[in-house]
Amino acid sequence: MSAWLLVDAGNTRIKWALVDSAADGWLAEGAALHADAADLAAQWGTAFGAAPPLRVLAANVAGTAVRTRLEQMLAAVAPGAAVEWFASSAQRAGLVNGYRNPAQLGCDRFAAAIGARALAPGRAVVVANCGTATTIDAIDAAGRFVGGMILPGLGLMASSLARNTAQLPQIQPGALLPSPFADNTDDAILAGCLSAQAGAIERAFARHGAVECILSGGAAPYIAPMLAQAPLLAGALRHVDNIVMKGLHAIVRAEGDPC
Ligand SMILES: Nc1ncnc2c1ncn2[C@@H]1O[C@H](COP(=O)(O)OP(=O)(O)O)[C@@H](O)[C@H]1O
Ligand SMILES: CC(C)(COP(=O)(O)O)[C@@H](O)C(=O)NCCC(=O)O
Ligand SMILES: [K+]
């Protein structure tokens, strides 16, 4: 069984995992901010040892310059590896893409939906990926990506207030507040942004009639405590590290090792 390198290049961070096609075949993982992307070569060198992967499956929504940079690094650390730049299509790994133009759907969202389907087969699911943007997508019990929402992520929401107002400061992400009705500016911003994120997820969950809500992404740890208090989501909330990567792994498992 040969190893695959999976890459999820989002707008803030590049995440990767080294896997094989077994269900529990998660061998190593790592991440770097775009500014520190050069660190990936060292991370990969350590993870690969003397056996670089022969196949790479990469989802990139961070633009062509990032893709070119990754191609150069991959050529150095895994020379000769076959690289597939994952793109949204009408159907893949048992998931049907309901976007009017399937290729327009962010490939990270399609991969996340494939991951959600793999984790909750035959169930109506909402998958919220809380990264630079927050995406909240609906997958039905028959395995169709129905559609979804895109909103500014938690960090973007907060920083847009700081950038576009005279009096509001840049806040740091923080823990759940005891009350949504804050008595100071920093907490009022945090309460507003967290409530907007959690509220959109709850609303999508209710509207879709979902039975499971998968929460992922770098901002998920801040949003999860608020969702955990939502009666609507009782017993239905599941925090999954990097659902995009889980989806790419599901594709590798579904399609197997080419001979
Ligand atoms: N150490 C960190 N560095 C950067 N962002 C972080 C960090 N910890 C949490 N975050 C939050 O996670 C978001 C990035 O999450 P991630 O899922 O990696 O996004 P993307 O897939 O868009 O690159 C940031 O916008 C921020 O809200
Ligand atoms: C919505 C996104 C910006 C999310 O990116 P991320 O927050 O993961 O960096 C990305 O999925 C994207 O560029 N989508 C293309 C448009 C669409 O999905 O309709
Ligand atoms: K996202």
List where the protein language model places each region.
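N-terminal glycine/serine-rich phosphate-binding loop of ATP-dependent small-molecule kinases
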Residues: 1-92
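Gly/Thr-rich phosphate-binding beta-strand-loop-beta motif of the actin/hexokinase/Hsp70
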Residues: 1-26, 116, 120-145, 161, ...
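Glycine-rich phosphate-binding loops at beta-strand->alpha-helix junctions
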Residues: 13, 59-66, 191, 210-227
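Adenine-nucleotide phosphate-binding core of ATP-dependent small-molecule kinases
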Residues: 30, 177-213, 237
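Short hydrophobic/aromatic-enriched beta-strand-loop microsegments
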Residues: 78-85, 145-151, 232-243
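Active-site neighborhood for divalent-cation/phosphate handling
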Residues: 82-127, 133-134
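Glycine-rich phosphate-binding loop plus the immediately following alpha-helix
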Residues: 105, 112-124, 146-189, 251-255
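Glycine-rich phosphate-binding/hydrolytic loop that grips phosphoryl groups
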Residues: 236-259
